[in-house]
Amino acid sequence: NCMVAQSGGPTAAINASLAGVISGIKKSGKYDTCYGAINGILGILNDHFLNLSEIMQENPDYRERRKTTPAMYLGSCRYKLPDYLDDDSPYVYIFKQFETYQIGAFFYIGGNDSMDTIKKLSDFAILTGQKQKFLGVPKTIDNDLALTDHTPGFGSAAKYIGASTKEVIRDAQGLTYKKSMITIMEVMGRNAGWLTGGFSSLFPNQAPV
């Protein structure tokens, strides 16, 4: 069997990534059942799962509908696993769950924190001789994951910011105040500037990057 979970902030693409993971699992023919952990890694710790294989059998259009479903179908969390050298109890329980549900592969869809979680689980598996496979599926509007060019979620967020900025510009142009005005827009992106840079590309002659 295998398991998939989502974590971090929702994007317009994260459920499409879920649909892609499920499609790949089905095409591989290697797994009997695909479970979904509710609210990320907390779903494993709290024994809260969905049997996605059963849901797909009952709803043939399930995967196609997920491609355009907003928010996060499996729910999210912001829980960070401790370093296993400091406290390995969550890891021991998680791998006990994997054994109970006969999990051979775990897919985690998310951003930097989620990739940190999947790496910790992989490292612990290697350290303790476990055989499960761990795969991180990138998702972040920040576009700041290593070894990626455009992360799923970045494009839709950049498009939204560009459209919103143009609307603000039109509002400012339509005002008849005699005094000039300055509008400041704050854009998300943590320590990365990709979203701001993506917006700036709309005005190459006016917005120095």
Predicted features and spans:
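Short glycine-rich or small-residue beta-strand-to-loop segments that form or flank ligand, phosphate
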Residues: N1-T11, M72-R78, G104-G110, G136, ...
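Short glycine/serine/threonine-rich phosphate/pyrophosphate-binding segments
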Residues: T11-V21, I44-L45, P82, S89-V92, ...
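Structured loop/turn residues at beta-strand edges in well-structured enzyme cores
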Residues: G29, Y101, Q130
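Proline/glycine-rich low-complexity loops and linkers
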Residues: V137, I141-T148
